[in-house]
Each structure stands twice: as structure tokens, then as C-alpha cells.
Amino acid sequence: MKLKHILYFTAIVLLAGSCQKSTTEEHDALFKSIKKVYELKPDGSMNYHYQHQLKYITHLSFNRMYGESFIIYHPDYQELTFNTVETTMADGKVVKAPENAFNKVLPRFAAGAPAFNHLREMVVTHTGLELGCTVNFDYEIHSRAGYLPFINENIILQEDVPVEQLEIVVKVPEGTELNYTLLNLDTEAKVSSSEGYTQYSWKFKNLNNRVYESNQPEDQRHLPRLIFANVTPEEALQQVAAEDSPLNDEIRQYVTQRITGKKKEIHIIRELQKLVGDEINDFNIPLEYARYTPRTPDKVWQSNGATPLEKSILLNKMLNFSGIKSELTYAQPSFMYDQSLGILNGAGEFYNVVTLNGEKLVLTTDARQANNQAFYLKDHVLLDIHGQSIDQPVSETEAEPEVMVKANFQLNSHGELSGRAEVSVLGANNPYLNYLDQVENAREVIQSVFPGNTIQDYEVKQFDFLGNKLSADIEQKELWKNQGDYYIFSLPRSSYGIEGEHIRILLQERETPLQLSQTINETYEYTVKLPEGFVFTAPEITRERTNTLGSVSITITEEDNTLNVSHSLTINQRMITPEEYHNFLELMHLWRNETFQEIILKKIQTEN
């Protein structure tokens, strides 16, 4: 009996211990320390010094996550030096990296981009890895004077695993101004001067690991980050505009050939988007590895490939040559914009702003662009190539999205639905460019709600850069599913509403914000005349939810054998914080509830 009690007590202790994992045991690895030092020398050369100590906790940490380290550099202008690459094993044995642990390869993003085949990626394979080991990694990159035009860093401070200590140091010659901003953390910079340098340092402790969830902000605005540069927006963008050479004769002749016979400006735009976006290869080289400096149009044309910036510049020059006034524009999320801080590294995108039919449109280089990109840039700052702020092409009130569907239908005893529908779309999902290109493309507005094969005829009542309104004759066969004497069907919703956000799984709670591409305002009002011999089985349905985030209203009533169906959803903000997420969840659970989407009819058996 005594032994039984001892075993029972031991089991409880072991179970309790297994339920109280330490922070270390909850993660695959742990950065004991990371240090990054950026140094600008008086002659314009730069030095980057990186160090870390990483403890490996699980097999995943060395099999998939941190078994190798990757360093991209330009061997002709940058010198890579390793100070320490060694592993301290769990028993204290130190294993230094052998010579064959260092291998140069072409960076993946430079594959197929001959103009950037000079870049190299040093792949460092860490050796002696096992559970509980620690890797000490220390290297430096020295850049020759003139290779990098300025300091331009945009550092997300979190890693995929926790960091116990992170230190970032920036050294610039005295008299050189360094502009910086720290987002989502409150640590102050420590500034000191010594030996002709001004030093800025930040120290962070116990940083949590990054959390990945669906529908996070694309610009990662929720993450802690440090941004610094020794140039203003004007000075940074001057580097982009430095090679402002005109199109050569060969390019001009080819452009002339491509646009000859095209009367409408939109057709010229589409042809040039197709030329630049589809027929010139994509060189997806990050700006920093292209030295923040675009190649000339001549070199781009000869290589038949371009970086995103080079494509925007080339399209801009082709548009202006073709008689369409275009302005190269840099769009930066407003949360990271500072008029004294010229950041290009992972901070924004380049577009072309043109005036078409008296309205300003923001263009990409994609020939499949359906709408005015300006609607997606409402929370961005737009800068011209000289770093000067320019007005938004659409105002906040004009940019509000809306989907409205109204229809009067008749349903026959064979489950065939027919009638007239009216669809209106305002804001970001309005396919204005597609409509200007081909009037027949207006049909896609109707198809956002009703299957294409159900549209018999349609009429365009309004279509401009802000929105549209169309009506259509709809005939749909086999609308319902039959289960005995019961017939079940649902009425459609638009892919331009919340369904277009592709939120597949609703977590019960989130650790990070959920971002929508736009605010939501969608309304559906249907009347359906039921066939004789069929009745609506459910009692009248009225469900409403309203909270600080928006509202849902679902109403289904029946009168004189006619159903009146009304569904509406509003979500009044794009960014939904974890604290507000429960409100979003409440609205979505009601909106997606199949009980209130399905309409169930019963066939009445008539007596012979």
C-alpha cells in the first residue's frame, strides 16, 4: 500500500511538471543574444557587423529552421569576413565550422536575372547541431565607398523564436544626421560621441516570437520595427531619379508600332501595361540589392527584364512618350512615413498616376489591373519623384466601398428562378479600367453575384471611376435541392463583399490584427414569388447584431406567398485588433450562419 501511494504521488508530480513548461521549452529555439552594428565611415564606405548566440531546443530548429544561415552580398564591392562560426554542444564540446560549411550560390531571386548574377549568397551550414546546443555566429560585411548610396534600414525586431537580448548600434561620422523612428515599442535611443563618430544604440530584452495568422496586415504594421536612414525622402528619391535618361530610338519606334491605330487612351495604357508587365521579364530584386538605383531604360530593354521599380519607370516614360501624362509616384504606408526619414527599404511601392477622362488614376504595370489602385492607398502617403507630397486621387468619402443588390424573382415548381436584378458597386471593387477597355466587361459586375450562365441580358445604367449600377435579366435552373417534400435553396451574395476577403477559418481569438482590403458595406434585398403548392416552412426570421465594429441584419418574411429577404453587413474599419476581434467574430458568425441563409420550402400534397 505504501509503494502504491509513492507511485501515485510521483505520477502527480511528473504530470504537474509536464504541464508547466518553461518559456524555453515552448519554442523550437531561443536567441540568447543578437547584435547588429551599422557603421558609416567618413569616406562613404560602410561596415555591417552581425553576431548571435542561438540555442537549439527541438529537432525542427536544426532540421528546418536554423540549420543554415544565408548572407547575400556583392563580392566585387563587398568583403565578407567570418569571425566566429562554432557550435557549443550540450556537453560543452566546441565544434568549429569546417571549410566545406561555407558555400557560395546565386540568390534565388537573382535566378533568371542576368543583370544581377554578380550577387552571391553565402550558405553557412552549422555543424555539430543537437538538442541543447548553442551556435555562436559572428560575421562582417565591408562595403566599398560608393557602393551603397546611403544607410537605409527597416528592421523588424521580432524573430520566429524569442530573443532574450537584442542590441542595434548605428555609428555615423560626427555632423552626419541620422533620422530614425521606433514603432510599437517604447525603448529610447542612447546617443553618444566618441573618436569622431556619433553612436546611436537601442537595447531590447525578452522579445516575443513572431506570430503568423491568416489575413494579417500585409505591411506588417503590427510588428515592432526600427527604421533609420541618413537621408530625407527627397534625397532618397533623388537616387531613384538619378538615371533620368530618355527612351532611345529603338524603344520609341517599337512603342509607336504597338500603339498605332489605338484611338482610346485606355487602349494605349493597356497595350503598354501588357508590353511592360507581361512581355518584359520580372527581376524581383529587392531595392537594397539593386543599390536603390534603377538601370537605364536602354539596359532594361536590352536585358528584357526589370525590377518592379524599373518597370514602373519604363511604363512612365512610355506613357508620356505616347501622349498620356504620367507621374511616377511612391506610395508609403502612413504609419511609417516621416518627412525627415527617407526609407525605401521594404517601405513602399512605385506607381504611375495618370489623368484619364478627367479623373486621376493610379496604375500598376499589370495589364490585368481592373480598377483604380488609389482606392487601396487611402492610408498611404503619396510622394512624387522629388519627395514632395501629392494629393490623394480620391477622397475618403468617395472611396467608401458599397455593394447593393436588389432583385424581384419568380420561382416555378421546377426550381427555376427568373426575374430582374439590379447590382451597384462603389469603391475599390469597381472594375472601371476593365469597363473603359471593353464595355462588355461591365458584365463582370453582375457575375460577381450571379453565375455567368444565368445572365440573359443586362443594361449599364451608370459606370464611372467611383462606381456603377447595372440591371440584368436572370434565369437560373435547378436552384434548389430536393429532400422528400422539402426544397432548399439560398440566394447569392457578391464576391465583392466580405467573401472576397477569403477568410476561410475564423479563429476563436487572435494574437495579431486582422486586416481587410477595405471596409465592408453590402446589402441584398430580394423578393421571391413562390410557386403554387409550396409554402415557406420557417417562422419569420429577424436577426440583428450591432457593436462598435459594425452590424448585421437578416430578415426573411412571407406575405401573399412572396418571400421578402433582406441581408446587410457593415464593418466600419479595415484593421481589426485582437481586442476588437470578438466583435468581428460575433458579426461573422451571424452572417455565415447557414440557418439564416437557407430557405426551406415544403410542397403541399394536394388531395385527388
Regions found by a protein language model. Give the residues of each.
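Hydrophobic/aromatic-rich core segments of domains that either
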Residues: L309-S395
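Surface-exposed, acidic/Ser/Thr-rich flexible loop segments
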Residues: F62-R64, S69, M122, G128-L183, ...
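Cysteine-centered nucleophilic/redox motifs
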Residues: H52, C133-V135, I168, L272, ...
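A surface-exposed beta-strand-loop module
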Residues: T84-I155, D186-R221, K406, Q410, ...
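Early extracytoplasmic/domain-onset interaction patches
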Residues: S22-Y73, E79, E396-V423, Q456-D457, ...
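Short, conserved helix/loop micro-motifs enriched in His/Cys and acidic residues
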Residues: N281-N304, S334
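Long hydrophobic segments that form regular secondary structure
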Residues: Q388-Q483
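Secretory-pathway-linked proteins and extracytosolic
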Residues: H142-A290, S413, G419-Y435, Q483-D485, ...
